[in-house]
Every structure is written in structure tokens, then in C-alpha cells.
């Protein structure tokens, strides 16, 4: 077997991408005169942590012979005995031994699309924790399927196109029946990357009522949208979900942060056991190019939607070694190096996340899942030097079974222009959107981080992982990090504050979110808390700066990797569209599941430092902070 020789910036994926708020992905709609922020889903979720759950289930009767799905189903039935619901086909058991089961509430056989229930089952077969956003109001008595007094799906498509000013021509659209109840695919349209779709669903509104809507799906590249169009008035759009997460990154790369920190180095056979087919095969075909089971990387100078026939470097002997110079211009002159770097960073991050539990059953990005669960045929499509934009990057996360798509842009902030692919932090931040969207709410639901606060946490997780991965042996808790400084050509980076444990350097507190209205700003607050948490756990368990964690009984043995594991496990525990308080509780529950709460007080102290302590409360307009610790800490 020939070894894979990659010439790339070596360093643990380091930096995150920073992006000015004015240029995040949804601003593509803003440039069309539409403010997508005003269409975000309302936060409806509740979360019962493991302590509260233990008290609640004492009064419930569960059979020891039940499997974890049956136990979860009984809990939902006992909690909402008058509700109808279905089991979502994406349940799995995580590497921490917790089973995750997801449910969707229904009414008259139709989904209530933002009414979810997630149940987490412990190793002992008992309910560990759960969350839900089920509708508790009165279900409409009349079945809409009887009189069918709702609009045609084509009208809904046209309503979405008009309301959001989408570049989709729908004059000749015709609806063709698709799989699923009241589901359709539209023929005769142009402008979308794939045929638009629609299905009839109910939607919980902000005022607590239900609306019958057409959920219209349109992938227009920079935005991949689910638009909830009123089924009785196609001119009314209630809410919008965008699968694309964007960021104006200014970042860094794996051991190295950016080209200022070192030179390209050749690495042989860098894959881990997470990639049993290597990076250049999917177990069926061996590819002499930057394509494999986890990712397919190519250039995309036109910014188009196709990728299979786009240019990739070819190497029959799998030696991908190409020249690069910091003075080279334009970036297209080193596209082979750029594509190779993007392919390397994406695969390396895939393998790291796999070790933490983002595997096939959890909904990761792979073509061939090897009968290990989940849905395959969904590697990450990663475009280098994408011509659809500049000074930015984005990642679209459809549900498990459909490929994720990353677009990496060139940056015009310096002369010569800079290529975002050379900053691993940008790539890591974007790929983390795929991680969090697949875990939160389950692999089959990619709409669980689309409220303002949960969307902010989506940005914060990207910043956190990019920063955690870039730590160096010389770093201490007094080390500060900026985001996106190299790509932005600005040493201060692109966030409001540096990531720092010093409250004078970074004064963000939980209550700061009360005055913030943009997801990247809110994300900076969340990532600041996670940065504090990481250093608290490093002080408790020591730090290691190896590329991969060392596990003992499933627990990373150093504080840095332990934080990454707990934060990731928390994503799978928390409810759909969580708030800060619920996400904090989910991390505490993740520690209970993994270490029997060995780090409980350390975690509480880290969050309390910035006001997310015991007694902190969520309110969309008036969050209450607390620096207190719970009894026993």
C-alpha cells in the first residue's frame, strides 16, 4: 500500500474564524433586503437535568426488560398522556453509554415541526435526563386533511421566494408527490442548487398558538432554508431555519496556527482508527486525489453548485506535495496546496471528533458507515477558494444522510490576498457547525440551533473548539487568544474581546446577552465561558498538547480534551434549541454520565465566574445572573 504524503501546515487544528457580524451567511438575505434574524424560531425548550430527573422517575414504573427506546417512549407517554407523537429514526447509544432517543409531536398525523422531546437513557437502563418543547395548548379540533382548505404547495413556494427575495424562478413550478405525508418536490424551477421541496406541518408560534404551514426547503447556496409559509395565506412567513452557518473568519492551523507560525511539513499516513479505509478510500474505491470516505475537496472558482467534476490534484502514488509561498499571488497559483490543506484539516478534525463519540450512529459525515449505524452517503463537500464570496466561509448541515457543504473563501484583507484554507481555525469553526447541528436534537433534525440564543451557542462552540485545539505547551490560564487575526490581517482579531480568563481583558458576563442581538456576539459570550471551563479543568487534571486524547475507561486524562468531550456530550443531551442555562446543565449531566460528577464543583465554579452560576435564570429580555454555587460546592 502506498502511503499518503501530505504537504500541509502541521498543527493541531487551531484557530477559529472570525467574521464581522455584517457579513455572516444570513446576510446574503440581508443584501436582498431581508432580515432573516426576524424570522428565527422562538425558544420553547425545557430541560430536566439528571438530579431533577432522578426525583421525578421515582414515581414512575419502568420494566427492566424494556430496551432504551421503549423506556424513553414510556416517559413521553407518561409526561404527555394526551399527546400524539412519533419516534424519530435516529436513536443511538453514545460512547459515554448514554442512549439518545428523539420524538416529534404530531397532530392529525402531521408533525408539529418545532415540538421535540429528547430522552437520555443511562447505562442502568433508567431515564438519565430529558428535554422537550412539546406544544401544551389546544390542538385544533378539525382535521385539516378532511376539508383540505389549505393552499396549494406551489403557492407556498412562490410565497417563500417572494417574501425572502430568493433567486429562484418558480413561474413554471409544478408539485410532484414525494415520500412522506403531504410531501412534495417541485419540478420546473431554476435558481436553486437542488429541487425545492415542501411538506405540510404545524408550527408553534411565539404567541403559543399553532399554525398550519408549508415547510418549504430551498437550497440557494449561501442559504439553505426551511421557510414556514402559512398554509392559509401564502404571503405570510412565520419562521425561517437556515442550514448554513457562516462566519467571517480570521484564523489559524494543526500544531501551527497560521503561516506565520511555521512552514509546511510532510506527514505520512496521518489517519487514525476513525478512518479504517484511510483518507483516500471509501472502502469500495481508492481515489488518487483529495477524495475519500470523510470528505471530498476541490477548488470552486466560479462559486457554482457542482463539485464532482471540479478540479482536484491528482497523485496515483498518493503523494500530495505542492509548493506554497507567503508571497505567492493570486491564491489560484497554489490551489493544489490549498485543496490538500483543506482536505488534511477536515479529515484530521473528523478523526479527532470520532474519538470523542461523533461517530456513524451519532450522525457524522461519511460515505460508508460500515454497518455501524446512522445514514451514510454524506461526506463533507469542502470547496477551496470558492468564488461565491470573499472574507468569509460557511457550512451547510442538512440532516444525516445528506452531505454537508463547506465553502472556504479568499480574503482581500491583505496584499497578497490570503486563502482561508490555510487557517485551520476557520475550517474547524465551520466543521463544528456540522458537529453541533447533528448532535443537538438528533442527527435527523438540523433545525435545533436556529433560535437567537441557541444559534449564538452554535457560533460559540465553533470558536471554542478552534481555540482549544490551538493551545500550545507554553500556554497558561493567562494566555489570551484572538479569533481570525491572520485572515483578517488584524492582530486583534474579529471578536469584541479576546478569549481570556481575565475579566478585565474580557468582561463578558451571562447578562451581557441581554443587550446582544447577533449570533456571533452571543457566541463570543458562550465561548468565553467554555474557555474558562477548559482552563479550570486543565488546572484540575493537567494539560496535554498531543494531537489526540488518551482515554481511561472512556474518560480523557487531561483537562483540555476532557472539556472537549464534555462539551460535545452536552450537545447530545440538551433539548432542541437550548438556552445557556440548559446547555450548562447538559454539560454538568455529561460529567455525571462520564465521571460520576467528579468535576461537578469545578464546572459550577467556571460558569459562576461569568454569572451562569446556581440560580441564574433565562428570560429572553431579562436574564438573571448568579455567581453562586450549589450546596456542596
UniProtKB/Swiss-Prot annotation:
One of its GO terms (biological process) is proteolysis. Glycans are attached at residues 410, 480, 622. The active site is at 430. Keywords: Glycoprotein, Hydrolase, Metal-binding, Metalloprotease, Protease, Secreted, Signal, Virulence, Zinc, Zymogen. GO terms for molecular function: metalloendopeptidase activity; zinc ion binding. It is an enzyme of class 3 (hydrolase). Binds 1 zinc ion per subunit. It comes from the Eukaryota. Residues 19-246 form a propeptide. Residues 1-18 form the signal peptide. One of its GO terms (cellular component) is extracellular region. InterPro entries: FTP_domain, Fungal_virulence_M36, Peptidase_M36, Peptidase_M4/M1_CTD_sf. It is found in: Secreted. CDD domains: M36. Its EC number is 3.4.24.-. Its cofactor is Zn(2+). Zn(2+) binds at residues 429, 433. Secreted metalloproteinase probably acting as a virulence factor. Belongs to the peptidase M36 family. This is Probable extracellular metalloproteinase 3. It comes from Arthroderma benhamiae (strain ATCC MYA-4681 / CBS 112371). The gene is MEP3.
